[in-house]
Amino acid sequence: LTLWQADRSKPAIPFDRKTQIGLHHLALEVGTEAELNASAARIREWPGVTIEFEPEPLAGGPRKHMMFAEPGGIRLELIWTGTA
């Protein structure tokens, strides 16, 4: 994974997954449900972060996930697989 510094003299263009090739979001697995909830609590406090949704069941559970965007606009998903 390589992250590049953006040229701030040009306006940012929102990503459209239907018309552009690129990163839609990055999913990261957490080990336990408690870690997911603790991560959500920490993320809520970060300046500039937009939470798309708090931890919620995924496909009827027991898996849970949350989605948020970091200040640069990259969407991140944290997922607990329902085991451990």
What kind of feature is each model-predicted range?
Residues 59, 82-84:
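A short acidic/small-residue loop/turn micro-motif
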